[in-house]
């Protein structure tokens, strides 16, 4: 249950990504800067945290042990996650992006066969977790229906396809890096290592931005800083703490990743308060209720599975 609570707190801070990205898009800011600035701003905060915790030596040893793996899975987990997400925010409405992002719930469950258990056998797709994730996804679809009716097909596709890529990339990169680190690094060290390893891609993106759209506005820089603190540092760290704690149980791990569905609730409220977005329709509110039910079912399933596991462990 602790992992579920941590995941929900992470979702709250992740929600600011969609709100501020929507705000920057409305102000005319480029998605290229919105994506790269977040990770540049994350570096000094993470360096300070890791330095105070004395983790630089461990991090350096891990990165030098497998630099190609760090570059590869950091690119997948951070670049292929956040660049498509910010592109979608510039191409579609915020509700569509935050709603479609919840596909990561199902993606996280479907990725299980790509990983080996401690016994060397590949994990199976946890069917109960998949079924519960499907319930949450139904709620997400209901939230989208009223708004999708008023959006063009091109806007819908530009808002959906990049986010589906991000929905698979984020849990895949996260889990692969957990395998690479093998529990030898704490969450802050792993996030810093992945952030630094993804820097070449962000630098290339910055060069592209300077050539095509010029420098970012002061408003976009400030909002990107807020995204870096709330989503990049606080939310990412909380989420990785939760997934680290659950990484040996695919059902529990899927439940933690499913907590990200609550982002939709936080984004709806946040956009209403900060951006003046109208209140969702009754059908959308039904979808919100289904999401909450799905979350409760995930939490209950996790609690029961944990109790059974403890009962089967000999004293």
Locate predicted features.
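C-terminal-most transmembrane helix of multi-pass membrane proteins
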Residues: 39, 119, 253-315
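Glycine-/small-residue-enriched transmembrane alpha-helix faces in small-molecule transporters
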Residues: 1-37, 131-134, 138, 149-179, ...
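Juxtamembrane C-cap of transmembrane helices in multi-pass membrane transport proteins
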Residues: 13-29, 34, 83-92, 100, ...
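Specific transmembrane alpha-helical segments of multi-pass solute transporters/efflux pumps
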Residues: 13, 55-101, 142, 230-247
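Hydrophobic transmembrane alpha-helices of multi-pass small-molecule transport proteins
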Residues: 46, 113, 124-147, 281-302
């Amino acid at each position: 249950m602790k992992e579920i609570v941590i995941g929900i707190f992470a979702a709250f801070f992740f929600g600011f990504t969609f709100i501020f990205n929507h705000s920057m898009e409305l102000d005319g800011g480029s998605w290229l800067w919105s994506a790269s600035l977040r990770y540049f701003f994350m570096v000094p905060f993470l360096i300070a945290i890791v330095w105070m915790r004395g983790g630089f030596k461990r991090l350096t040893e891990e990165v030098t042990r497998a630099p190609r793996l760090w570059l590869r899975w950091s690119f997948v987990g951070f670049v292929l996650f956040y660049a498509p997400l910010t592109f979608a925010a510039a191409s579609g409405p915020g509700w569509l992006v935050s709603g479609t992002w919840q596909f990561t719930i199902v993606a996280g469950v479907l990725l299980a066969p790509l990983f080996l258990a401690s016994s060397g056998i590949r994990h199976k797709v946890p069917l109960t977790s998949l079924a519960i994730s499907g319930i949450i996804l139904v709620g997400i679809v209901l939230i989208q229906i009223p708004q999708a009716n008023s959006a063009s097909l091109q806007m819908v596709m530009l808002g959906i396809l990049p986010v589906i890529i991000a929905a698979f990339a984020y849990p895949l990169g996260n889990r692969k890096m957990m395998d690479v680190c093998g529990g030898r690094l704490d969450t802050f060290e792993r996030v810093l290592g992945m952030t630094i390893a993804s820097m070449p891609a962000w630098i290339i993106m910055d060069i592209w931005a300077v050539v095509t759209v010029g420098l970012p506005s002061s408003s976009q820089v400030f909002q990107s800083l807020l995204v870096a603190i709330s989503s990049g540092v606080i939310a990412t760290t909380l989420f990785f703490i939760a997934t680290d704690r659950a990484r040996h149980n695919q059902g529990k791990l899927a439940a933690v990743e499913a907590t990200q569905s609550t982002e939709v609730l936080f984004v709806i409220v946040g956009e209403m308060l900060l951006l003046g977005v109208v209140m969702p329709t009754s059908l959308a509110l039904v979808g919100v209720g289904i999401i909450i039910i799905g979350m409760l079912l995930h939490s209950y399933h996790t609690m029961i599975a944990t109790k059974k596991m403890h009962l089967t462990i000999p004293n």
